Amino acid sequence: MSLLVVFIGLASFASFGDYINPNLDVTEVRASHILVKTRPEAVKIRKEIVNGDISFEDAAEKYSLCPSSVNGGDLGYFKRGQMVQPFSDVAFDLKVGQISDPVGTKFGWHLIKVVDKR
């Protein structure tokens, strides 16, 4: 019974996986994204951003179908695996400030910009 109490106490302190493996990757990414229906739309928007015709945030507000568009596409911080694949993998592979090529998911086509990592 005391082992159960210890386990429950530890579970409330940290997730079981974090307790078992203290070297677990806890890196979080803060990313913004633009969600559109088609790959050609995403390619066109990315070109506008890269050419300096529009900022990523303004493009998100103008084009994105996601409710995050009102915040410039900001999704906040998230851990690996918390977002749909391959979105999550691409976000974690990008460097801060980098904008992805179009990424297809079941929701549509995304442009991802990593804002911060911690």
PLM feature spans:
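Solvent-exposed coil/turn segments that connect beta secondary-structure elements
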Residues: 34-41, 65-66, 80-83, 114-118
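Short, flexible coil/turn micro-motifs enriched in small/turn-prone residues
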Residues: 47, 67-71, 92, 103
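Peptidyl-prolyl cis-trans isomerase
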Residues: 50-85
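A generic structured-segment signal
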Residues: 44-48, 58, 89-90
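Proteostasis/folding factors centered on peptidyl-prolyl cis-trans isomerases
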Residues: 3-35, 86-118
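Short alpha-helical scaffold segments that flank and stabilize functional sites
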Residues: 45, 62-63, 94
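Second-shell loop/turn segments in exported
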Residues: 30-34, 43-50, 74-77, 98
